[in-house]
């Protein structure tokens, strides 16, 4: 007689209970608040909704948020990758301290970060005074917004790329150099394919964080309409005016943009993984 297979005792409850808890948490934390947002927006007719979200000042705030968040995320992608590389490949005094400081923007209240960055970049601050000699203003300009978004976004890239770099065997780089590859070829043909999915993920999270950032930006931006006024500030202004329908309408557009960004991120990451997996397989076949 065949022995009946015994079911493995699982530490975590079975699929039914686990799935039910997951759906309940997802519903209370994510779905219900989003549905509330849609319900408040529904108080406006379709024409009123379109009029609200396409006013020149609102469109300008979208443009400022998108442009500054994109530029900051691109800079984060470059600087974050370099920082991750230094932390993984080199040993130096204070390495652990630097590794901990990178996570400071995660723990620091955004309002505190905004006040600190503003004092640093005004004409009386260290950075502001230095760049002021060259006629460059940071505080109360879009450059200040980008500076703040770089500060809050760079940990996303570093923490996404760092663990992947730790898994990349340095022998691959040594083998590439022995085969005559230049440093540039080693970076783009050996290292970049390994870290690209993580880099895309870190860039996207930095971009998404920048779009919704309020606390660290509101102090340094100056909040000049059509110049440095961001979309989250427009939402807050509408709430202070008790215009909840307009506030939720503007927020709904931002939510839609965030969903698009995350969807594109998922598609790019999956295609990138498939692309470089197939390339690696072709290389192995060629070697054989």
Q: Model-found features: residue ranges?
A:
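Membrane-water interface segments at the C-terminal ends of transmembrane alpha-helices
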Residues: 10-45, 54-166, 190-215, 236-240, ...
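Juxtamembrane non-transmembrane "cap" segments at the membrane-aqueous interface
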Residues: 220-225
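Conserved small/polar residues in nucleotide/adenosyl-binding loops
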Residues: 276-281
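Membrane-helix/interface signature in polytopic inner-membrane proteins
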Residues: 162-174, 182-183
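Glycine/proline-centered hinge or cleavage motifs at structural transition points of membrane proteins
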Residues: 179-180, 193
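Short, Lys/Arg-rich, polar N-terminal cytosolic tail immediately upstream
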Residues: 1-11
């Amino acid at each position: 007689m065949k022995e009946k297979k015994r079911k493995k005792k699982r530490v975590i409850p079975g699929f039914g209970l686990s799935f039910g808890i997951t759906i309940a948490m997802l519903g209370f934390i994510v779905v219900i608040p989003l549905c509330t947002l849609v319900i408040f927006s529904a108080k406006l007719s379709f024409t009123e909704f379109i009029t609200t979200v396409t006013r020149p000042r609102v469109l300008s705030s979208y443009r400022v948020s998108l442009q500054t968040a994109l530029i900051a995320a691109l800079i984060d992608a470059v600087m974050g990758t370099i920082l991750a590389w230094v932390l993984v490949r080199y040993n130096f005094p204070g390495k652990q301290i630097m590794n901990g400081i990178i996570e400071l923007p995660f723990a620091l209240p955004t309002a505190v970060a905004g006040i600190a960055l503003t004092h640093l970049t005004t004409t009386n601050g260290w950075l502001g005074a230095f760049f002021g000699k060259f006629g460059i203003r940071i505080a109360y300009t879009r450059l200040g917004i980008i500076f703040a978004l770089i500060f809050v976004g760079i940990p996303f890239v570093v923490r996404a790329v760092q663990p992947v770099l730790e898994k990349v065997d340095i022998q691959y780089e040594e083998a590439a150099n022995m085969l005559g590859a230049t440093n540039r070829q080693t970076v783009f043909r050996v290292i970049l394919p390994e870290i690209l999915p993580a880099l895309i993920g870190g860039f996207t999270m930095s971009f998404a964080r920048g779009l919704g950032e309020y606390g660290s930006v509101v102090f340094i931006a100056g909040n000049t309409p059509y110049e440095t006024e961001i979309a989250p500030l427009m939402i807050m202004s509408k709430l202070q005016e008790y215009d909840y329908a307009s506030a939720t309408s503007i927020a709904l557009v931002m939510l839609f943009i965030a969903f698009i960004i995350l969807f594109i991120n998922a598609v790019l990451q999956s295609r990138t993984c498939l692309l470089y997996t197939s390339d690696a397989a072709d290389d192995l076949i060629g070697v054989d």
